[in-house]
């Protein structure tokens, strides 16, 4: 998910981040459950939000971290490590 859950769940996280004027965003790998982005968090990575960021520039920065974090979490799970950050 393209935000640091539980902040900014839903389909347009980047726009929500920008309109809130927070200085840090990021991405979350989580278990999918029946709620809205409410599953157990398995990993997160932070990125800065810069003054003047557009939705596209923030999305690109977050996507780079998503592409780094997702395989890292998969590797940890496949090697038998506990990766749950919350319950």
Q: Where are the model-predicted features located?
A:
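Donor/substrate-binding cores of folate-linked one-carbon enzymes
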Residues: 2-85
